[in-house]
Amino acid sequence: ESFINQGSVTNNGTINAESLTNTSSITGNTGSLIISNGGTNSGTISQNIVSITGGTLTNNNSITANEFNNSATISGSGSLTATTGNNSGNITQDNVTINGDYTNTGTITSNNNFTNSGDISGDGGKLIVNNGSNSGSISQDTLETSGTFENTGSIIADITNGGTFTNNGTIGTNQNKAEITNNGTFTNNNSVIASAITNSENKTFTNAGTVVTDTITNNGTLDGNGSITIGGGENSTTGVISQNNITINGNFANNGDMTANNSFSNSADITGGGNLNINNGNNTGNITQGEITVDGKLTNTGGSISAGSIAN
């Protein structure tokens, strides 16, 4: 049956509701609220366990649960705070806070602010975030950001950034590499291990840490005083790459500007009509460029270097 609350309910037992209409408060540290066919919440809900098993629950105020389980649809402009639980459905809220071990195999969308200090995992899971932060761990298929997002924890996911993303933690591992598409501003101050990085035209990827990627497609600006190791890819005519240290391990087409301010190492084939600027470095592969400038010392061992002009 439907559960309608317009007053104040303290529940430390179990409420099974076909649908919920709550305009006031439902509290109880040990209580369980189970909703089988959605409803509306314009009040406050604070329970030990909240489970939504069917229908659509529209939450325009707040739900706080030690364990929050959803296999249906949560919509609205409210706030959701959970410590543990699982989501296999769709959750859309203005604000989402996760404080513990949470399994997401569905989709969680946070339109205003997302905060994770716990461990979010789940195959097939998708996080869509406007503004937010992660100080815990995120292991998901996809993380999409559109506002300001900071990571001080660990992330394993394919990341699409349309806002301002700052990484002060770790993204990807050798066993679980990330795929990053930057359509905004991306700053890495620590570690990124990626299978692929795409930096869009007129967008900026600043690396002051360490980036290792199997392949990169750079149509914008990749700058900073960090180190990058590239397994292959392309720097287009609109692309600019400037790093302290650059290592090329796979075939790479440079048609833009690429500068290594400290050290440069190439063991593959670099092709294209771009400009390559090197301080100190070594080449055991093949380099063909429009222009090569060496400010320090370049050691060529068993490789070939060809350019329209070479300045030393």
Model region roles, listed by residue range:
Residues E1-N312:
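Extracellular beta-strand-rich, repetitive "passenger/adhesive" scaffolds
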